[in-house]
Amino acid sequence: MKHVEIFTDGACKGNPGKGGWGALLRMGEHEKEMAGSEKETTNNRMELMAAIRALEALKQPCRVTLHTDSKYVLDGITKWIFGWQKKGWKTADNKPVKNEDLWRALVDAVRPHKVEWVWVKGHDGHPENERVDKLASDAALAA
């Protein structure tokens, strides 16, 4: 199984407002940058979109190390999701899960792969995180 490193970030100009996401996929020497935007969105939705689109870009099942600076994405997919699914997409206090559509899409995007989730501190000089932050910010400005 091939190993792919993925770095993701989301950005929003206003929250809600114009938003963008960026992703960097790296397999050995090969790299691919991706970005996208929405006119009316939130930062959390863009963080989720970055991970979803990056995973969907993989053409075969892979071992993935996915780096994100979003505790929302990291905690959501590694901790909270199991309870949400058990409770019919309700939170611990029985409210509907925000961004359920994207959480469901992320679950589907993860399914074929073996994903290790890694948190990286944002805006701390991490080169790949800085790259995807710029991709996301540029995409948000262009939305």
Swiss-Prot record:
One GO term of the biological process aspect: DNA replication, removal of RNA primer
Annotated residues for binding of Mg(2+) 1: 9, 47, 69
Co-factor: note: Binds 1 Mg(2+) ion per subunit. May bind a second metal ion at a regulatory site, or after substrate binding.
Binding, Mg(2+) 2: 9, 133
CDD domains given in the database record: RNase_HI_prokaryote_like
Superkingdom, taxonomy of origin: Bacteria
Provenance organism: Novosphingobium aromaticivorans (strain ATCC 700278 / DSM 12444 / CCUG 56034 / CIP 105152 / NBRC 16084 / F199)
Oligomer status and interactors: Monomer.
PANTHER family registered for this protein in UniProt: RIBONUCLEASE H1
Keyword tRNA-binding: no
Family to which the UniProt record says this protein belongs: Belongs to the RNase H family.
Name of the protein in question: Ribonuclease H
Localisation per UniProt entry: Cytoplasm
EC number per UniProt: 3.1.26.4
InterPro entries, sorted: RNase_H, RNaseH-like_sf, RNaseH_domain, RNaseH_sf, RNaseHI
